[in-house]
Amino acid sequence: KTWRQVDGVPRDVPINTIAQDPQRPDRVFVGTKQALFMTHDGGETWSRRGGNLPFGDFTAILINPRNGDEVFAGNAYQTTDVGGGVFRSTDGGTTWARIDPKGRRLPSQRIWALAFDAHDQNVLFVGSHSAGVYVVPRMSDTLSSTQ
């Protein structure tokens, strides 16, 4: 076998993270320094995801192993009003909503890691750049610190 570079994902920006849907292996998400991309056909074609996602540094992607339509994306691009934070899609990555809305945002919106609790899939761990680890119930927008 030989290596083959895919078309449709920028080649001139860092690739931060890649996640594959465990139920639909042809569906893959790629987080770059500028945007989030997705393929439905195993990498033959790619599309840039929008749907309320900000510009920026996508550093973490988490797909619900029991429901591939639920996807979380962590963004590390932080400015005063836009970017950074945790975003959730319930339609396979077409539309997105913040799970840390304004007024209740993480102390650091620079998100670096996401994980489900191995004992409770309703709990999400959020690792930040400089403010520790936070826990959020998956269906909630209330974050609590584990520090």
Name every feature range the model reports, one short phrase each.
Residues 1-147:
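Extracellular glycan-interacting surfaces
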